[in-house]
């Protein structure tokens, strides 16, 4: 590693007294320039200016013959990396060198984490300045912070640079040694990575659990009870309670069953079926129940710590439906424009000035009683103290309220505002008083025949909201649960009170498979396992999606069959490389390098070549990564790793998913015409998730003719029309006649070229309401007629068409696409209706209707329009295109009926349009000056 203080070998210096400040981005440069004044020139490097070669063509000619050239790391010379200036950054480097000639000092003002320190070091090594170099570090972009950083620079942190370089080299060695194994044994263009492969394994392991899961059924009774019979003033007079015990034995609930549907402790609980639950309810008919006990307890809930990187990603995913990548992109903008502090941090601590700012703001907005009696300090064990900046909070010594910044961040930047508001709420709430309330637990008894039954009800009321005035934590929709401020009121009852039974409902349940990971829950899992670092989570999640290992279904992360094959290969032949504890241990050792407690050369040598000790003990002692790959490569059976056994059919024949070059397919051996075992195959659509591939589904796919089901002839062309199951779902297509060609031409390959250059058959994906086994010729011809010309826009003269795409039905006018609510609209929408859609402002991101509906329902009897269920910011909702109504607790997307959907819409219309809460009259307080913004 070069000495950062090296001078006299590059450009710079003319006695002008000016300073050059280099940052990563133009936005950051403009902001700093506005604060530093004319004595400083602020320019950006636009990210990293050099890196390891990305491809063989990037390797300089003099190194191409070296055995290590493909790695870009000289493994025989202390793992010296080969850095090249990125082609697109050469002009930037030239500009920076030119600016150095007119200044007397260089300030490297890149971010203060590993990555920022590395960028600063690369700038130093590339520019080779002959003038004094200083490292300028700040964690928020406000005028006081920037001026303080310029007045108190520090030296470059070489330990931090070493840590980043070690990670970069490690990831290069891991990726460039293991990825070629995947190319040879699974498929081209795949990649392996130190963290991405483990993240993929976590998701695959969860899907395996779902595939092995067996649901268990159980019943109980939901009772609606009336307390007014013994207390006319009871409030509320009616409430619900659930059956919890019969004849002294606890009634089984979902948590009493394991993942295979077996009772964990069968002798301690009673499992009710529909018949026994119905009989118990009948036995209670005409009786009263009695309050056996009523226990009321106070509770208090402390506020949550301010955000760090991982918790911001999790909560933005849950509350705002942002991906981890989107969250970090918006946070980067907010930071660079001076709205928040640095967004890559493992810390939950606040500075003294930030604590005072939060407490002052809470007092002004909510009153003295809402502020914690003493400042709250949040500490946690930080993996790397050198990266432990302050928590993510609003920038400045006084915080700009959401109302104050709304005007600046509204409109096209509304997502920036929403994330700022979330950060502001969490920060202010962290210094507020506890939320307080009461819980009430009721135990209610009765007799069903000769058996004593026990019902239970639990209520919760909030007596003092405390920090919940500012911030309410949400829950992951796929996991279930209630938000912090959810209340359930019960009447205040005393033992011995009699209760009338209003209604008894035998209630059936089934255990659910473990929920798939969402981006939020995957980030939480990675953090709990100590795998990766919060600053890398968003890029890891993006990578595993870009590589085709994972795709999203709603907000859930679903693994592909390729991910199953890759994970299986790595587990079987490179088990330690995807072991959770091993990967976490590597992270800890890399942090030791950052702290200066470990030499990176020794560590890399043990990992790559082997040794007697070091982080990767099992890898080091087996000869290192290089030997591990060499030994295993030839022994890997490609067919075996690309074969995932599902189950046996009813004849005991194993059914496999095979991962082929054209996608996954099903296969089993059946008796052929000669009696010999013959492979039977079936196309496997990507739309079928692994846990949905049951024996019944497999048999249906095997029964589907692979050449497709013939529907008939197109009366216009005479071409045969068939329906097929494809990789991307069921579709219809036409069979074109073979082009004519004489034998001589065919022998020379002309026929093959004619076919390639000839007309392509028309195809059309089936609508969601269609089924491969029942689709008709008429349906197919309608699909093949798309896109349908709706008409011509009289204003622009452009043609408007209705089409069906990967993300659902949509309109297209030139380059402007607008989503439709239902697939039927493709064939029914009129020009006037289309023009109305185009007259509305185009909505962006989650506000747009680009995502297909979760489910299509029937027609709403009130509006006469089709109803669909869509995925919205606050969860699933039903809409007829005019009225939106959120699904309520107990409503299930898969089973909700047309009648229930219409009921929700009718109820929403009856309540009228949503109204904004009236502003409270605020006490007059002296106005605080917000941080200066340009």
Swiss-Prot record:
Reactions performed catalytically: ATP-independent breakage of single-stranded DNA, followed by passage and rejoining
InterPro entries linked to this entry: Topo_IA, Topo_IA_2, Topo_IA_AS, Topo_IA_cen, Topo_IA_cen_sub1, Topo_IA_cen_sub2, Topo_IA_cen_sub3, Topo_IA_core_domain
Cofactor: Mg(2+)
Cellular component terms (Gene Ontology): cytosol; peptidoglycan-based cell wall; plasma membrane
Domain Toprim, residue spans: 18-142
Activity modulation notes: ssDNA cleavage is inhibited by MazF4. Relaxation of supercoiling is stimulated by DNA-binding protein HupB.
Binding residue positions for Mg(2+): 24, 111
The EC number(s) this enzyme carries: 5.6.2.1
Chloroplast among keywords: no
Annotated site, Interaction with DNA, chain positions: 48, 167-168, 171, 176, 183, 344, 547
Top-level EC class: isomerase
Region ranges (Interaction with DNA): 191-196
Active-site annotation: 342 (o-(5'-phospho-dna)-tyrosine intermediate)
Residue ranges of every copy of the Topo IA-type catalytic domain listed in the record: 157-616
Segments for region (Disordered): 1-20, 746-765, 842-892, 905-934
Chain's role: Releases the supercoiling and torsional tension of DNA, which is introduced during the DNA replication and transcription, by transiently cleaving and rejoining one strand of the DNA duplex. Introduces a single-strand break via transesterification at a target site in duplex DNA. The scissile phosphodiester is attacked by the catalytic tyrosine of the enzyme, resulting in the formation of a DNA-(5'-phosphotyrosyl)-enzyme intermediate and the expulsion of a 3'-OH DNA strand. The free DNA strand then undergoes passage around the unbroken strand, thus removing DNA supercoils.
Quaternary structure, from the entry: Monomer. Interacts with mRNA interferase MazF4. Interacts with DNA-binding protein HupB.
Other comment: Was identified as a high-confidence drug target.
PANTHER family on file: DNA TOPOISOMERASE, DNA TOPOISOMERASE, TYPE IA, CORE
Similarity annotation: Belongs to the type IA topoisomerase family.
Protein name: DNA topoisomerase 1
Gene: topA
